A protein has these predicted regions:
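Basic, short loop/linker segments at the boundary and entry of helix-turn-helix/winged-helix-like folds
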Residues: 1-31, 344, 348, 352
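Helical catalytic core of nucleic-acid polymerases
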Residues: 2-5, 15, 22-23, 48-58, ...
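Anion-binding and metal-coordination hotspots
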Residues: 19, 30, 37-50, 61-425
């Protein structure tokens, strides 16, 4: 690895005293510890004093936990550059196919408990709860003449009033900012659906994995619980990272959670990207769906399941209808409840959406490899490397922490492919 391109910075020190630690040695220390599931700065500090392998790797460095934590905080750009340098090396070793990648996301818990995540509705309940307590304490004071009991009740009353005021102020602030949810410890984290656990306060970690050797090429962290809006963003980053040209389109596999018209249109406009996205089921389970109506591009008409022709209505909205045929159609109850009959909307991007459906069907066998391709790295990150929650706070810092985990996974993957002597050579 070319250390000069990483641009790690030394820890800032006073004019007197020992010189700062070598940042490359600090970086090696982080990779070793993450590789072995040691993540917190205090645990790393302990290992630096007793772990023989780590003492050898770092030339006997024994930094304290604050220095260790500050290195990660002060070298965000350098850590991201290191990830990109890893990918460049893996590409040189021909470990990246540059033909097919799979994109998926997983929820990683934030350093913010569910208790410290509030919504307007939750605040209303808390305010009501403390209001009831205040009334109860006032009632007890009016009925109690014993000094010791009175002092205890007054103390509880004071705390209840303070809590009520705190929640009312927080509610007013949230309403002023126009937000319905707020995390009190990590302000960027959000409550999200977590597999098998209902909901939790978390971040949405996105990875794109190359099909050849399961190397994570691109990674990102989002605050949006849904994967929608992430398709083109991740596909574009991956194409840029791998220097894909328009002559060699990159096939991107993604599940139905990424199906979004705007993203599919952007992918279609970018000739470097060939998006194969699972098609979600249409809303509603009863009656005929839009996909049951066949469009004839030459005649600009739709043919319904009953064989009737729907022509374009002369108006601003591109609707295709046939009120007369619908009125006497025996399948009307299965098709629509509208008195005017069934209307099919065809917007300007309908052709792209139809080609996306066709592309998915034509590449279904390739799409089936998506799950084992992209889920495998997430399993390794969580089960083997212990990456089930973030230790840092705010989006900027958790992105940095995520890069370290992804580099560790990629290193672990490469060491399973090559023997160490081969890799050193």
């Amino acid at each position: 690895m070319d250390e000069s391109v990483l641009k790690f910075t030394h820890s800032s020190t006073k004019s007197t005293g020992r010189p700062p630690y070598n940042p490359i040695s600090m970086f090696k220390m982080y990779l070793y510890c993450y590789f072995n599931g040691i993540r917190s700065s205090r645990k790393i500090e302990r290992e630096c004093k007793r772990n023989i392998e780590l003492l050898w790797l770092t030339n006997g460095l024994t930094p304290d936990h604050k220095t260790i934590a500050n290195f990660r905080k002060d070298n965000k750009k350098a850590i991201e550059s290191a990830h990109k340098e890893f990918i460049r090396i893996f590409d040189k070793l021909k470990l990246i196919g540059k033909e097919v990648v799979a994109i998926d996301g997983t929820k990683i818990r934030a350093d913010n408990s569910r208790k410290n995540n509030v919504t307007i509705n939750k605040l209303n309940k808390l305010i009501e709860y403390h209001d009831e307590n205040i009334h109860e304490y006032l009632k007890q004071l009016s009925q109690n003449d014993i000094a010791e009991s009175t002092d205890t009740i007054k103390s509880k009353l004071k705390k209840a009033r303070e809590k009520k005021q705190e929640y009312e102020s927080l509610k007013a602030q949230m309403e002023s900012d126009g937000i319905r949810e707020k995390s009190l410890i990590d302000p960027d984290s959000r409550r999200m659906g977590v597999a098998n656990k209902g909901t939790d306060v978390a971040y949405n970690v996105q990875n794109s994995v190359d099909a050849k050797e399961h190397i994570i090429v691109t990674t990102d962290v989002a605050t949006n619980p849904a994967d929608q809006t992430q398709l083109y963003a991740m596909a574009e980053k991956t194409a840029n990272e791998l220097n894909i040209s328009e002559d060699e389109a990159l096939t991107v596999l993604a599940d139905k959670g990424y199906w979004r018209k705007d993203d599919l249109v952007e992918c279609d406009n970018d000739k470097r990207i060939n998006a194969v996205v699972s098609v979600p089921k249409e809303q509603g389970t009863k009656g005929f769906r839009k996909s049951d109506f066949i469009y004839d591009e030459d005649k600009d008409i739709y043919t319904c399941p009953a064989g009737n022709t729907l022509t374009r209505w002369k108006g601003k909205t591109p609707n295709y209808t046939n009120p007369k045929a619908c009125k006497n159609c025996p399948y009307k109850d299965k098709c629509t409840k509208s008195k005017r009959g069934r209307a099919i909307l065809r917007d300007e991007h309908e052709e792209i959406m139809e080609s996306s459906v066709k592309r998915y069907k034509d590449n279904y066998e390739l799409y089936r490899s998506r799950q084992q391709l992209v889920e495998h790295p997430f399993g390794t990150l969580k089960r083997s490397l212990g990456f089930t929650y973030f230790l840092t706070r705010t989006l900027e810092n958790v992105k940095n922490e995520n890069f370290l985990h992804v580099m560790t996974y990629n290193l672990k993957r490469v060491l399973n492919i090559f023997r160490v002597p081969e890799l050193v050579e």
